[in-house]
């Protein structure tokens, strides 16, 4: 299958990173290579780029997309949470001029129904971005305690019917394990009252999102990647993060705010005793969102938020 993925907020990312001919850039979620190709084009074909992705199919697609930049690109199969060790192994720690993290599932992964990311087609309950990952959605649904399933749905999906859905999942699995996306959708439809099913899009949307985040430990990966990205940047280098979920955006916002703080000593202290210095300058006080034009072309950009900061 051809890897189809439209890069979100592309012009905004280029404006944020301001690629230059002698620059070194890192795309922590290279996907189909759309953002990476545009970054390299902006460097007049002279810049260098390190591309990471844990999905081997995405990496193969990126290799094709970036073929004309082959001499300037280093592609590594790795989760972006390991970007610190990748950069260190390549001898580039503290030398990266711009880093992009585009968090979440790609449109291509959603299109590959057999991977179980979408509630619109029947497939095994997998949801792993890395096919070698340890835990599948089926294992969570069939093996985790009811309380833990409730927590996942409530925290990661912000699903108001989390408790009922978790109860219905456990009741169903005592009779027969949940094996397919259709099994899960049927349980969700049964758990959510009929009137509530008519609200806010597909009734399974939040549950599928929550399971995907849990299976891939997306929030944990982001929390590890942000400090590693800051260390990897050169002075004045920029970090651009695109998130699609309020929890992810909150993590990015709080990290930027914390790293932008300087001395925390009381105002009446004559000399700083804490030694804390700001490491980041926030470029986007409010997240950048997609234009009306982009929303028409790429519906995925509807929930996309871009935050940018610069290393001091």
UniProtKB/Swiss-Prot annotation:
GO BP, sorted A to Z: rRNA base methylation
This protein's GO CC annotations: cytoplasm
Database matches in InterPro entries: RsmH, SAM-dep_MeTrfase_MraW_recog, SAM-dependent_MTases_sf
Binding site for S-adenosyl-L-methionine: 33-35, 53, 80, 102, 109
Pfam families from the UniProt entry: Methyltransf_5 (PF01795)
GO MF entries: rRNA (cytosine-N4-)-methyltransferase activity
UniProt KW keywords: Cytoplasm, Methyltransferase, rRNA processing, S-adenosyl-L-methionine, Transferase
EC number: 2.1.1.199
TM annotation in the entry: none
Compartmental location: Cytoplasm
Catalysis: reaction(s): cytidine(1402) in 16S rRNA + S-adenosyl-L-methionine = N(4)-methylcytidine(1402) in 16S rRNA + S-adenosyl-L-homocysteine + H(+)
Primary location: cytoplasm
Top-level taxon of origin: Bacteria
Enzyme class: transferase
Gene3D superfamilies recorded: Putative methyltransferase TM0872, insert domain (1.10.150.170), Vaccinia Virus protein VP39 (3.40.50.150)
Purpose: Specifically methylates the N4 position of cytidine in position 1402 (C1402) of 16S rRNA.
Protein family according to the UniProt entry: Belongs to the methyltransferase superfamily. RsmH family.
Protein name: Ribosomal RNA small subunit methyltransferase H
């Amino acid at each position: 299958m051809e890897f189809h993925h439209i890069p979100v907020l592309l012009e905004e990312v280029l404006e944020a990173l301001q690629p230059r001919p002698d620059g070194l850039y890192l795309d922590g979620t290279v996907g189909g290579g759309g953002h990476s190709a545009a970054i390299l084009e902006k460097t007049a074909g002279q810049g260098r780029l390190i591309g990471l992705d844990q999905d081997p199919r995405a990496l193969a697609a990126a290799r094709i997309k970036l073929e004309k930049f082959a001499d300037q690109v280093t592609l590594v199969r790795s989760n972006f949470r390991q970007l610190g060790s990748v950069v260190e192994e390549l001898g580039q720690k503290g030398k990266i001029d711009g880093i992009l993290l585009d968090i979440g599932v790609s449109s291509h992964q959603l299109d590959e129904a057999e991977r179980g990311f979408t509630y619109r087609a029947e497939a095994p309950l997998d949801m792993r971005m890395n096919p070698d990952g340890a835990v599948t959605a089926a294992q969570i649904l069939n093996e985790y305690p009811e309380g833990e399933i409730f927590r996942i749905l409530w925290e990661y999906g912000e699903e108001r019917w989390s408790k009922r859905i978790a109860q219905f999942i456990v009741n169903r699995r005592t009779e027969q394990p949940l094996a397919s996306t259709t099994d899960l959708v049927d349980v969700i439809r049964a758990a959510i009252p009929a009137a509530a099913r008519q609200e806010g899009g597909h009734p399974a949307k939040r549950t599928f999102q929550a399971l995907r985040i849990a299976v891939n430990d997306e929030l944990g990966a982001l929390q590890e990647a942000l400090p590693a990205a800051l260390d990897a940047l050169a002075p004045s280098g920029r970090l651009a993060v695109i998130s699609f979920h309020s929890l992810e955006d909150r993590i990015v916002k709080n990290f930027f705010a914390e790293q932008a703080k300087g001395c925390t000593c009381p105002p009446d202290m004559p000399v700083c005793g804490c030694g804390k210095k700001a490491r980041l300058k926030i470029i986007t006080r409010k997240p950048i969102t997609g234009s009306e034009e982009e929303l028409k072309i790429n519906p995925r950009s509807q929930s996309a938020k871009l935050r940018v900061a610069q290393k001091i």
